[in-house]
């Protein structure tokens, strides 16, 4: 049994803190329930033999919790025999859909409170059988598309997968460009039917959730023989508007009928395809993995063959189940204080927030409680929910009341303060409610003044510390539960001072730079130096290739910057630091180097072969920019190339230029690189992608030619122009042709830019006639130049002569020899031999073609003892001539299926004598005429072949290595199955039988062949 798990995410954040109002050593260690396992959505197969289903629930708590379960918000009576509990796990015996389907919640409690689990749905899965009615035959002309409907039976859930059987189980059809099975509806789509598609088809449906499969009654598909016609692309599998959840994988299907098989292309309207998109199933399936919000948009599938194209669009919407931005955690609050518990979730649509306290509905929205009391303590759950899911955050609220105590956090016994500096003495007792604070120095009570301040949190601040401030300081804390104090001694130290500060430095990229930093400090304290660049502390371990410190002299923090790069420029700060105070000094490092990237590329004007660009200067890195270089890239290439510009040399003080000699109607991106005396900088960010304006084509198609084809056809071919030469939209070709020597040209238009072929049909066209042809390109802006004129020939007539003297000869049970007398027509290119079994229709005939120099052939892989019809016809590029008269012939019966049983192999001097039993043919097999024996080296296929009518043969003992002896019966139907033994001349030992058994017989080995 498998479980169908929905993504019900539950976050539990329970950290136990004892309630000070229930002080006992045992109570101080307790905490409320924390879920370790929660129920999940489960599908129980209706046909399951398990007889029970479980819903899991487990929580940790001190003291140990109690469990109860709810079904559709009603308490489950666990005293009934149908239910049992193991810990928190609920076991339902003999589950029934009418009583047990629904939403389950596990409720866990102890003395600290109650929490509810996430809801889990128990549903019942099923997959009914297909209807028993037989299907009618589906007859389709060859070349026409077909759709076989699956129509799956009633089922739950909807996660079905589909395949199609061909003729028998478990033979599944192979999917390719021509055949596609939709995983949305299960239908089988065939772009164009071929004779090989003949057969019986069955829709095979599997439900992974309940591990069950069923298949439909077989649907007979019968292709109707016909001269294949061409049909334009026609999309039949169309994806619908799709709603996907953030992070999910999305599958879109698209498939088209048509002849020839249409090419499928995917795109996203006005945007690039997602980086995680993957196209499979010969283009019929688009998968977007881990979909993100930016992947939302309009997607298009385009199907095209040279006869026409079809498009389909639909939108993908991306939404999201709730996810925590800020959630609640276990909290301990003082009695009488205020509570604000932020609980924020993101999702699409925006989730709603509601609260449970001890498993009972409490509030909605944000949670604020003023003047906390002991009654506010308990287990709280924040629930975020939208249409796509629900998440829980659990936390325990403890209310604390206690007198002040410094046991856990006493004041430091010794506090150090730098002369002339500032010191803060902390006072942090544990107390609830918050205590009032007062301070004394010795016996003197301290009050706020110009140098002394007592903060609300109890801390004491002293500024401009002098020797007179040394002494004993005591903090007093008091609330309505009691009072406490803690004392420490303040001692003054010498202040830390920078005595040699770093100086500004100016270097070139690749050079080294040094920054001095020396400090004085209290000799009783340790001194460390910290360097930062532009406010960020330098990590000397990670940056050891460029930064190095002087660690030899304690008071010297000198910094060495090696192989300076542009990124090292900025403000360096040296901080000399002790545990008491610190002192800092800063200096600037100026780095001269190649320019930074220019910015703000704008395209001001777009022409067919030129664009005008402007940009803003980047940083010159303290060396004036001497020139700019503009580079371009088309969507046809990933390579950036230097562009031709006006002016040809762009000086460093310029911020605009024209790019010329561009390709019309081409998508371009541009970037700019600055150069100064120190080198060439990094390129700018690419500009927005633009398309140049269109222009008439100026390149003629090449390789114009053609000829051949079917009767009464003129076939014209050319090499299609690549995309870069289209120069505009609505691109196509104008094909001109005329009989050789005539004046008027006939013109036709080919609108598919990828097609390089046009076939003109004219029943009055004489065969093998010279034509002059030429081709030119056009687009919406005009026509291009014609190609050079080529001379081709119209198609010749199909042969009219019938092959004569056709004769056939049976060679075996699976082979027939066919011969004929050649025809005299010179246009014949070859001969076609058709043959089909008498019990098949002529449309199912198989064909063999040979050249015009051959007047016989062998038909192989025929069925034994079967009547075949055979005819012969001549053909050329224009078609097939009339067939000869049909000849009937019956193949031989099958050769004997029994292998010879080798009964002995005896060595006698330099010979082996091998004996076998007679093979008796079955009634449907050809009679045995004799035996063939092949004597060959082991591992080779060729050897010496013997024929005999006896049941024994002598073969020489091998001089070296092993030999194999093969024995098979021979009949007019062919050779039967083979039996083998191995013999060797190395020793006098017995030969090895490849398939045999040993019989006790006076030193003679008996074998049975296979």
From Swiss-Prot:
Disulfide bonds join 57-106, 150-203, 254-301, 343-382, 427-475, 517-574. It is a lipid-anchor; GPI-anchor. The keyword Hydrolase does not apply. InterPro entries: Contactin-1_2_Ig1 (IPR047102), Contactin-1_Ig3 (IPR047100), Contactin-1_Ig6 (IPR047101), FN3_dom (IPR003961), FN3_sf (IPR036116), Ig-like_dom (IPR007110), Ig-like_dom_sf (IPR036179), Ig-like_fold (IPR013783). Keywords: Cell adhesion, Cell membrane, Disulfide bond, Glycoprotein, GPI-anchor, Immunoglobulin domain, Lipoprotein, Membrane, Repeat, Signal. It is found in: Cell membrane. It comes from the Eukaryota. Residues 33-123, 132-215, 232-317, 322-398, 404-491, 496-592 form the Ig-like C2-type domain. This is Contactin-1.
């Amino acid at each position: 049994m498998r479980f169908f798990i929905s993504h019900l995410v539950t976050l539990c954040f329970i950290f136990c803190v004892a309630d000070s109002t229930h002080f006992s050593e045992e109570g101080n260690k307790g905490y409320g329930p924390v879920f370790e396992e929660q129920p999940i959505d489960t599908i129980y197969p209706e046909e399951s033999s398990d007889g029970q289903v479980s819903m899991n629930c487990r929580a940790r708590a001190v003291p140990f919790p109690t469990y109860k379960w709810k079904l559709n918000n009603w308490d489950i009576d666990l005293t009934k025999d149908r239910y049992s509990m193991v810990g928190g796990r609920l076991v339902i015996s003999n589950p029934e859909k009418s009583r047990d389907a629904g939403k389950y919640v596990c409720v866990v409690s102890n003395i600290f409170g109650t929490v509810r689990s996430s809801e889990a749905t128990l549903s019942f899965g099923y997959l009914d059988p297909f209807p028993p009615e037989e299907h009618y035959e589906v007859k389709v002309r060859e070349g026409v598309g077909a759709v076989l409907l699956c129509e799956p039976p009633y089922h739950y859930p909807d996660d079905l997968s589909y395949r199609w059987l061909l003729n028998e189980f478990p033979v599944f059809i192979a999917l390719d460009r021509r055949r596609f099975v939709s995983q949305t509806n299960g239908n089988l789509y065939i772009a164009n039917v071929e004779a090989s598609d003949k057969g019986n088809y069955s829709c095979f449906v599997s439900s992974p959730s309940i591990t069950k499969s069923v298949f439909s009654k077989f649907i007979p598909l019968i292709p109707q023989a016909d001269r294949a016609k061409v049909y334009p692309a026609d999309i039949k599998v169309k994806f619908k508007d799709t709603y996907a959840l953030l992070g999910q994988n999305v599958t879109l299907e698209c498939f088209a009928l048509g002849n020839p098989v249409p090419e499928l292309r995917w795109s996203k309207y006005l945007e690039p395809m997602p980086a995680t998109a993957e196209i499979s199933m010969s283009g019929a399936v688009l998968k977007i993995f881990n979909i993100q919000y930016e992947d939302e948009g309009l997607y298009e599938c385009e199907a095209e063959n040279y006869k026409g194209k079809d498009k389909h669009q639909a939108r993908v919407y991306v939404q999201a189940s709730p996810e925590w931005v800020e959630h609640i955690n276990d909290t301990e609050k003082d009695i009488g204080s205020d509570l604000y518990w932020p609980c924020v979730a993101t999702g699409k649509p925006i989730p709603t927030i509601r609260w449970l306290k001890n498993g009972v509905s409490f509030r909605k929205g944000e949670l604020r409680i003023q003047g906390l009391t002991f009654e506010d303590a308990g287990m709280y759950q924040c629930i975020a929910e939208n249409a796509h899911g629900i998440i829980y955050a659990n936390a325990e609220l403890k209310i604390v009341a206690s007198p002040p105590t410094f046991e856990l956090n006493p004041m430091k016994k010794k506090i150090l303060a730098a002369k002339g500096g500032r010191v803060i003495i902390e006072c942090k007792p544990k107390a609830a409610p918050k205590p009032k604070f007062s301070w004394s120095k010795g016996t003197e009570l301290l009050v706020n003044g110009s140098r002394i301040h007592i903060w609300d949190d109890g801390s004491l601040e002293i500024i401009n510390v002098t020797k007179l401030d040394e002494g004993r300081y005591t903090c007093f804390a008091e609330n309505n539960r009691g009072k406490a104090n803690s004392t420490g001694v303040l001692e003054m130290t010498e202040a830390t001072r920078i005595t040699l500060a770093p100086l500004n430095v100016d270097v070139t990229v690749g050079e080294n730079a040094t920054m001095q930093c020396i400090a004085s400090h209290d000799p009783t304290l340790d001194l460390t130096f910290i360097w930062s660049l532009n406010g960020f502390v330098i990590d000397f371990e990670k940056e050891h290739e460029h930064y190095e410190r002087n660690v030899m002299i304690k008071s010297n923090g000198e910094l060495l910057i090696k192989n300076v790069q542009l990124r090292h420029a900025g403000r360096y700060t040296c901080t000399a630091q002790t545990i008491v105070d610190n002192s800092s000094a800063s200096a600037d490092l100026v780095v001269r180097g190649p320019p930074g990237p220019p910015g703000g590329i704008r395209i001001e004007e777009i022409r067919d072969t030129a664009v005008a660009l402007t940009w803003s200067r980047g940083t010159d890195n303290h060396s004036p920019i001497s020139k700019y270089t503009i580079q371009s890239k088309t969507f046809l290439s990933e390579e950036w190339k230097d562009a031709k510009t006006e002016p040809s040399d762009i000086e460093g003080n310029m911020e605009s230029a024209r790019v010329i000699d561009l390709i019309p109607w081409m998508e371009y991106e541009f970037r700019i690189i600055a150069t100064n005396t120190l080198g060439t900088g990094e390129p700018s960010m690419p500009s927005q992608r633009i398309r140049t304006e269109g222009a008439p084509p100026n390149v003629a198609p090449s390789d114009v030619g053609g000829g051949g084809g079917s009767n009464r056809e003129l076939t014209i071919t050319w090499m299609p122009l690549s995309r870069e030469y289209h120069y505009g939209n609505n691109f196509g070709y104008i094909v001109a042709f005329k009989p050789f020597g005539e004046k008027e040209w006939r013109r036709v238009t080919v609108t598919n830019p990828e097609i390089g072929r046009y076939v003109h049909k004219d029943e009055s066209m004489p065969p093998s006639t010279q034509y002059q042809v030429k081709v030119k390109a056009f687009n919406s802006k005009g026509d291009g130049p014609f190609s050079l004129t080529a001379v081709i020939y119209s198609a010749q007539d199909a042969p009219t002569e019938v092959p004569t003297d056709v004769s056939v000869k049976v060679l075996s049970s699976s082979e027939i020899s066919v011969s004929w007398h050649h025809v005299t027509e010179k246009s014949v290119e070859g001969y076609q031999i058709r043959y089909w079994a008498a019990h098949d229709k002529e449309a199912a005939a198989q064909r063999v073609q040979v050249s015009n120099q051959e007047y016989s052939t062998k038909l192989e892989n025929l069925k034994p003892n079967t009547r075949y019809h055979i005819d012969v016809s001549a053909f050329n590029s224009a078609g097939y001539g009339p067939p000869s008269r049909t000849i009937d012939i019956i193949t031989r019966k099958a050769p004997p299926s029994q292998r010879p049983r080798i009964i002995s192999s005896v060595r006698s001097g330099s010979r082996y004598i091998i004996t076998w039993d007679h093979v008796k043919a079955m009634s449907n097999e050809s009679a045995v005429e004799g035996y063939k024996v092949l004597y060959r080296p082991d591992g080779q296929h060729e050897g010496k072949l013997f024929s005999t009518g006896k049941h024994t043969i002598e073969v020489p003992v091998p001089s070296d290595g092993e030999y194999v002896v093969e024995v098979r019966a021979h009949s007019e139907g062919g050779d039967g199955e083979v039996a083998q033994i191995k013999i060797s001349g190395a020793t006098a030992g017995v030969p090895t039988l490849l398939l045999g058994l040993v019989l006790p017989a006076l030193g003679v080995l008996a074998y049975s062949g296979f």
